[in-house]
């Protein structure tokens, strides 16, 4: 049952094949077995069981709230959840319990979804590995698949076997791992420069970033207001569309959301792609791109072409400036947003009371990690009076040029862009931490952050590499053409038969490992 899609398990609930409580208990059991992956910061067991019980009562009365009623979900720990700790994986917010739900969380709960818990991330969502949070790194479940372990057996000879585990990508790595291990059927992530698509690509799930303004940001603890978007992680594209249909629409609490009513996101079964024009940005063929990803990218383009679609090379001429532009704008907004964490209103406060200034400084030193403090310093530098015009204003102008590049390509007749999501497959943790967060983020966001600056929708379905690891390929659509984008991604997913089949195989491979780790965890506690 846990291996089914959201739509399938929803039908099973309606037909009485399983009850919401039984489903919730199965997921809770799996959360305990996979605890060593560190996907969850908080497991809301009591809340989940109570919500499942209420859902069960509705089903018995024949009053189901819809496709999400009784469905286990998870939420990244930078969305406010009423009565449940929301930490952003930071000492600054340890112990903070919001008095309200983020709009997207409330919408899911209003549809009867069952909240399993809050998922792990990089501190304040600043990172691309889910390795820099105060609760420790998230392990990629694919590290324990039979195929990967066999392929890397010779490399790990003489090493501690567990030192070879893979990163999940970030910053929504906990959400991606939670979906990949069947502990929930959908999860919320956030996406500022690729934080939903990157871990989705590494963990073998679907990661969807909606158009900016389509989904409310209210209650998402802000990183970069002009780029932040709630992201959706599911096991298949259809499930992402179901969740998007529940979340999309105007929110009076978020002035950036669309004013017009949003139609339901029902995806048609696309059988003929001959009328599609697929664009391949030539600037995305970088020297750093791995041969494995490049090969799969080429095969995907050939697949569309063989089915009659028009596949053309296009140019996004300002691509080479995008990562630098993103860094300036991102850190500038980070500096502004992080200013609210001063130890007075909520969150951590140090014991120093010599002066207000000393208390501020010590609180922020104790509350933020080096990555967050570094981005604050960079942002404040760019916002200095003598630097403002040369950095921040110039970056805003370049951002407009980058957005116009996409507009020009789509106006030329291109329906969807096809690009890699990441430069390579997931790498081992020990290799990942050899470089600093800033360097890694610049590498890992290279194909994803421009979409956030342009406000476009993007989705990352996946294929499987020769090494037995997921590789993400990104589809980018016109602003507010999310349904068309997901329809194309659904067609592609059907052709490559991924990820649901492979995820089931992953769980079959890993089940014995999970049981061993669970027993080891119990014996250590004893």
Curated annotation (Swiss-Prot):
Keywords, in A-Z order: ATP-binding, Ligase, Mitochondrion, Nucleotide-binding, Protein biosynthesis
Main location: mitochondrion
A GO cellular-component term linked to this record: mitochondrion
Locations listed in the record: Mitochondrion
Enzyme class: ligase
Protein's UniProt name: Glutamyl-tRNA(Gln) amidotransferase subunit A, mitochondrial
Keyword Protein biosynthesis: yes
Role, per record: Allows the formation of correctly charged Gln-tRNA(Gln) through the transamidation of misacylated Glu-tRNA(Gln) in the mitochondria. The reaction takes place in the presence of glutamine and ATP through an activated gamma-phospho-Glu-tRNA(Gln).
Catalytic machinery residues: 76 (charge relay system), 171 (charge relay system), 195 (acyl-ester intermediate)
NCBIfam families assigned: gatA
Molecular function as annotated in GO: ATP binding; glutaminyl-tRNA synthase (glutamine-hydrolyzing) activity
Subunit structure: Subunit of the heterotrimeric GatCAB amidotransferase (AdT) complex, composed of A (QRSL1), B (GATB) and C (GATC) subunits.
Record has Ribonucleoprotein as a keyword: no
Record Pfam families: Amidase
Protein family (similarity comment): Belongs to the amidase family. GatA subfamily.
EC number of the protein: 6.3.5.7
Catalysis: reaction(s): L-glutamyl-tRNA(Gln) + L-glutamine + ATP + H2O = L-glutaminyl-tRNA(Gln) + L-glutamate + ADP + phosphate + H(+)
């Amino acid at each position: 049952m846990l291996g089914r899609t959201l739509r399938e398990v929803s039908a099973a609930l309606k037909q009485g094949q399983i009850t919401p409580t039984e489903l919730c208990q199965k997921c809770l059991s799996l959360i305990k077995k996979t605890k060593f992956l560190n996907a969850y910061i908080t497991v809301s067991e009591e809340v989940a069981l109570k919500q499942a019980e209420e859902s069960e009562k509705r089903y018995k009365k024949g009053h189901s709230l819809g496709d999400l009623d009784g469905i286990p979900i998870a939420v990244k720990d930078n969305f406010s959840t009423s009565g449940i700790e929301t930490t952003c994986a930071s000492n600054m917010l340890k112990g903070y319990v919001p008095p309200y739900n983020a709009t997207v969380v409330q919408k899911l709960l209003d549809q009867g979804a069952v909240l399993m818990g809050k998922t792990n991330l990089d501190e304040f969502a600043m990172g691309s590995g889910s390795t820099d949070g105060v609760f420790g790194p998230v392990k990629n479940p694919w590290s324990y698949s039979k195929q990967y372990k066999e392929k890397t057996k010779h490399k790990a000879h003489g090493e501690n076997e567990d030192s070879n585990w893979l990163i999940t990508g970030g910053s929504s790595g906990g959400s991606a791992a939670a979906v990949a291990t069947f502990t929930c059927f959908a999860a919320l992530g956030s996406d500022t420069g690729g934080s939903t698509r990157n871990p989705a690509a590494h963990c073998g799930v679907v990661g969807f970033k909606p158009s900016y303004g389509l989904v409310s940001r209210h209650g998402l603890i802000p990183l970069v207001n002009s780029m932040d978007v709630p992201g959706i992680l599911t096991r298949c594209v259809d499930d992402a569309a179901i969740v998007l249909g529940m979340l999309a629409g105007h929110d009076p609490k978020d002035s950036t959301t669309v004013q017009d009513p949003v139609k339901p996101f029902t995806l048609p079964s696309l059988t003929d792609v001959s009328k599609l024009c697929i664009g391949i940005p030539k600037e995305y063929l970088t020297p750093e791109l791995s041969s494995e990803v490049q090969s799969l990218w080429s095969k995907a383009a050939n697949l569309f072409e063989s089915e009659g679609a028009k596949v053309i090379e296009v140019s996004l001429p300002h691509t080479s400036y995008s990562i630098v532009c993103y860094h300036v704008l991102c850190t500038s907004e980070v500096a502004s947003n992080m200013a609210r964490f001063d130890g007075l209103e909520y969150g951590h406060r140090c014991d120093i009371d010599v002066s207000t200034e000393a208390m501020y400084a010590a609180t922020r030193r104790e509350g933020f990690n080096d990555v967050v403090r570094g981005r604050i310093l960079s942002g404040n530098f760019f916002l200095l009076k003598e630097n403002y015009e040369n950095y921040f204003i110039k970056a805003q102008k370049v951002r407009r040029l980058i957005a116009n590049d996409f507009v020009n390509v789509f106006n030329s007749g291109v329906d969807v862009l096809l690009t890699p999501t990441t430069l390579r497959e997931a790498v081992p943790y020990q290799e990942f931490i050899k470089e600093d967060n800033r360097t890694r983020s610049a590498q890992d966001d290279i194909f994803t952050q421009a979409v956030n600056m342009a406000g476009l929708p993007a989705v990352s379905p996946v294929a499987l590499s020769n090494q037995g690891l997921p590789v993400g390929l990104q589809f980018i659509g016109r602003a507010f053409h999310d349904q068309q984008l997901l329809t194309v991604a659904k067609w592609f997913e059907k052709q490559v038969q991924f990820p649901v089949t492979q995820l089931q195989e992953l769980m079959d491979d890993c089940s014995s490992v999970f049981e061993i780790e669970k027993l080891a965890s119990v014996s250590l506690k004893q």
